[in-house]
C-alpha cells in the first residue's frame, strides 16, 4: 500500500513539474521546489535509529520544509562528505534559484550545461532531510523540458557511474559546501561530461523509438529489446488490450499449447517485462512497444 501511495505521489510530482515547465514566462521559485517536496513525501514522518552504543534516537522528516538537522553521506571511498548546514540552506537555495533564473534569461549556457550545473549545486546543498535525489531529478527534467529536451533517467545500473562523476567533480571543486553550492561550470567538468553523455543517449533512444517502428521491437528500462520469437510480442499486445486475460485464452489466441504459453510467461516475468496484478488478477505490462 505504501509503495502504491509513493507511486501516486511521484506521478503527481511529475505532472506538476511538466505543467510548470510548460509556463515559459514563469521563473523557478523556492516555493515550487518545496511544494514538489511536500507532494512527494506527502506528510511528516518520524525516523527511528540506533546509535553505535545501542542508544535509540528519532527525528521528524518535514515534508516541504528545509532541513533542521545537518546531513552528510559516507562515500564509496569511506569518507564522510558534509552538505550545507541547516542555517545556511535557505540563503544558498535563494542564491541557486536566483542564479538559475538569471542564467536562463542570459542564454549563454546551453540547457544541458544549465541543468548539469544546477544539479551539482543543488546536490552540494542537499536542502531537505530526505527526498533530495528525487527533487534533483525532477528539477533537472524541469530545466530540460523548458528547452524541449527529452527527460532523462539515472537508472539503477548506472548509479555507480553517476556517483563517481559527482565525486570527481567534488575533488575539483573542494569539500566546502558553500563553495560547492556556487561551483562554476569549468570546475564540474567530470560531471558535465557524464551528464552530457546521458542526455545524448536519451536523444538517440528517442530518435530510434520514433523512427524504428517494428512489431518485435520494444523498449524496457531505457534499452532496446528485439524479440526474435514473434509470440513474445503477440502475448504482450494481448495483455495490453486484455489485462485480465487467462492462460487458456492466451493459448487459444496464440494457437499454441499451454506449456508453451507458460514458458513465454515465465521468461517475460523473469526479465521484468510483465508482472501479475495481485489484487485485480491478470497482468501488468512494463515494457513499451515501438509500434
Which positions does each model-derived feature cover?
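FIC/Doc superfamily catalytic core
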Residues: 1-130, 134-291
Amino acid at each position: 500500500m505504501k509503495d502504491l501511495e509513493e507511486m501516486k505521489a511521484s506521478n503527481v510530482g511529475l505532472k506538476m513539474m511538466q505543467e510548470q515547465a510548460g509556463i515559459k514566462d514563469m521563473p523557478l521559485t523556492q516555493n515550487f521546489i518545496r511544494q514538489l517536496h511536500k507532494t512527494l513525501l506527502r506528510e511528516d514522518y518520524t525516523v527511528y535509529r540506533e546509535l553505535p552504543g545501542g542508544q535509540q534516537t528519532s527525528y521528524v522528516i518535514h515534508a516541504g520544509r528545509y532541513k533542521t538537522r545537518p546531513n552528510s553521506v559516507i562515500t564509496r571511498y569511506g569518507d564522510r562528505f558534509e552538505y550545507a548546514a541547516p542555517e545556511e540552506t535557505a540563503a544558498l537555495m535563494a542564491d541557486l534559484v536566483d542564479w538559475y533564473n538569471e542564467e536562463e534569461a542570459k542564454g549563454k549556457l546551453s540547457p544541458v550545461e544549465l541543468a548539469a550545473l544546477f544539479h551539482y549545486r543543488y546536490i552540494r546543498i542537499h536542502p531537505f532531510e530526505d527526498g533530495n535525489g528525487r527533487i534533483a531529478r525532477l528539477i533537472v527534467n524541469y530545466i530540460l523540458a523548458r528547452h524541449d529536451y527529452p527527460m532523462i533517467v539515472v537508472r539503477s545500473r548506472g548509479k555507480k557511474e553517476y556517483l563517481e562523476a559527482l565525486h570527481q567533480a567534488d575533488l575539483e571543486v573542494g569539500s566546502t559546501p558553500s563553495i560547492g553550492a556556487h561551483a562554476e561550470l569549468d570546475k564540474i567538468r567530470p560531471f558535465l561530461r557524464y551528464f552530457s553523455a546521458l542526455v545524448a543517449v536519451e536523444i538517440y533512444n528517442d530518435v530510434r523509438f520514433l523512427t524504428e517502428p517494428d512489431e518485435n521491437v520494444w523498449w524496457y528500462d531505457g534499452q532496446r529489446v528485439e524479440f526474435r520469437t514473434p509470440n513474445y510480442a503477440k502475448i504482450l499486445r494481448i495483455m495490453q488490450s486484455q489485462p485480465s486475460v487467462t492462460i487458456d485464452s492466451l493459448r487459444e489466441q496464440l494457437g499454441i499449447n499451454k506449456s508453451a504459453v507458460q514458458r513465454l510467461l515465465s521468461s517475460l516475468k523473469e526479465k521484468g517485462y510483465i508482472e501479475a496484478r495481485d489484487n485485480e488478477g491478470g497482468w501488468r505490462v512494463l515494457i513499451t512497444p515501438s509500434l
